[in-house]
Amino acid sequence: RLPSEAEWAWGARASGSELLKFPWGDAFPPPANSLENYADNTSAYVTGRVLGGYTDGHVVSAPVGSFKANQNRLLDMGGNVAEWVHDVYSIPSANGATEVDPLGGQSGDNYVIRGASWSHSKIAELRLSYRDYGQAGRDDVGFRLARYAE
């Protein structure tokens, strides 16, 4: 099964009792040794925009496991390809309240896509809270499988 959006967000952002802003911490831009796959100098001719001064060595997606795991031992949560999750896309609440284990929209035409990919370089796109939506596949979107704990 695909993870829910809440499961994906926990796996990407949870670091003890803290929620990370970016895979590397709270400061921007990423350090040179961040080792996540974003729109860097090597992909400039493909993406048209890059994260200046950053090079991860991959023009587009990298093989899984090319970069070290995050604090929860999960690979590629902050870059490489963005990921489909199970939830139907709905616009977040305007009051800014944090939802606890939200179930997402009950119906709709678009599904949630979480995380940054090799084609992203803007500060908002690199945040672990970044979310997108879509119906059709893209060359910078993939998926991961989740299973129920026994």
Where are the model-predicted features located?
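Short, structured beta-strand segments at or near domain termini in extracellular proteins/domains
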Residues: 139-150
